């Protein structure tokens, strides 16, 4: 009998816009409560963190607008793709987050979703402040200058 080819799973789902649009102040790692078919979809890379955010309601942290495409081989009920999902944190961590987010201009933004070596899905969550347009331009300008300097160093070394 021939050996079945191993299926490759997605490494991590990254929210690329988050680092561009927000100034990251502090990061946390949280578990996420999902249905079985949602975990299978995330393993296949059929998830997106774009435009997602987290809110704190009644001492619980909820992830909003995370897109998880329904698993195509699911025989059970089909879940909504952008439903609210509960994040799993300790009470002390939630209290700390709530105290920091209550400051003006701070929000909770997911940076990436990844699997631990034990197969658990975790969300890297950040306390962030929105950047102004001129901050974004300045960041792009600095990045471009650094890239140019690196090219010159490589050329003359």
Curated annotation (Swiss-Prot):
Keywords: Cytoplasm, RNA-binding. The keyword Protein biosynthesis does not apply. It holds the Pfam family SmpB. GO terms for biological process: trans-translation. InterPro entries: SmpB, SsrA-bd_prot, SsrA-bd_prot_CS. HAMAP family: SmpB (MF_00023). Belongs to the SmpB family. Required for rescue of stalled ribosomes mediated by trans-translation. Binds to transfer-messenger RNA (tmRNA), required for stable association of tmRNA with ribosomes. tmRNA and SmpB together mimic tRNA shape, replacing the anticodon stem-loop with SmpB. tmRNA is encoded by the ssrA gene; the 2 termini fold to resemble tRNA(Ala) and it encodes a 'tag peptide', a short internal open reading frame. During trans-translation Ala-aminoacylated tmRNA acts like a tRNA, entering the A-site of stalled ribosomes, displacing the stalled mRNA. This is SsrA-binding protein. The gene is smpB.
């Amino acid at each position: 009998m021939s050996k079945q080819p191993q299926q490759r799973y997605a490494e991590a789902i990254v929210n690329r816009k988050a680092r561009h649009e927000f100034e990251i102040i502090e990061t946390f790692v949280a578990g996420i409560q999902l249905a079985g078919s949602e975990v299978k979809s995330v393993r296949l890379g059929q998830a997106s963190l774009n435009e997602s955010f987290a809110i704190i309601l009644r001492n619980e942290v909820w992830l909003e607008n995370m897109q998880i495409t329904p698993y195509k081989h699911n025989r059970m009920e089909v879940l909504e793709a952008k439903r609210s999902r509960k994040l799993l944190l300790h009470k002390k961590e939630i209290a700390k987050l709530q105290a920091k987010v209550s400051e003006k201009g701070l929000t909770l933004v997911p940076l990436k979703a990844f699997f631990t070596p034990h197969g658990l899905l975790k969300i890297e969550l950040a306390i962030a402040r929105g950047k102004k347009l001129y901050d974004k331009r300045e960041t792009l300008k600095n990045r471009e200058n650094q890239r140019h300097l690196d090219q010159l160093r490589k050329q003359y070394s």
